[in-house]
């Protein structure tokens, strides 16, 4: 919550406001000057909580503490968000089958730990016109991963790379 979003003390310029104290005591509908005087007497700030209400609602509180609590809540919410990690595995069109097996084995480990895996097939200049070789390589990978993961989209040509992103399949609850 930024300072620009909240009106404080002298910035509140309404004729009448509904005033509430920090501990929940209701002062009722009073003039904004009177509410400001009450806040100054208590050594606190007058904070506009709900400007769209009729009349607007103000609260007498310690604004610094209010901001600290709001920032703390936002920080906790960010901590609880799940970060999706994407692992990238590079392949070429000339890759041998045992190398594909090795890389897919690692991809399976990543997928089982909940990570997303992006396979990137590098196409050489002569292969850019006919990206079938890259599609064949990704096709081999798709067959090996069909039980564990699903491709989020069809393979897509981006510059000199053919990309496909795999996400773990949802585990069925019994």
From Swiss-Prot:
Disulphide-bonded residues: none
Sorted UniProt keywords: Cytoplasm, Initiation factor, Protein biosynthesis
Entries under Pfam families matching the protein: IF3_C (PF00707), IF3_N (PF05198)
Primary location class: cytoplasm
Gene Ontology CC terms: cytosol; membrane
One GO term of the biological process aspect: ribosome disassembly
Record carries keyword Protein biosynthesis: yes
Compartment(s) where it occurs, according to its Swiss-Prot or TrEMBL record: Cytoplasm
One of the record's GO molecular function terms: ribosome binding
This protein's record includes keyword rRNA-binding: no
PROSITE patterns for the chain: IF3
Function text: IF-3 binds to the 30S ribosomal subunit and shifts the equilibrium between 70S ribosomes and their 50S and 30S subunits in favor of the free subunits, thus enhancing the availability of 30S subunits on which protein synthesis initiation begins.
UniProt family annotation: Belongs to the IF-3 family.
Assembly behavior: Monomer.
Protein name as annotated: Translation initiation factor IF-3
Originating species: Helicobacter hepaticus (strain ATCC 51449 / 3B1)
Name of encoding gene: infC
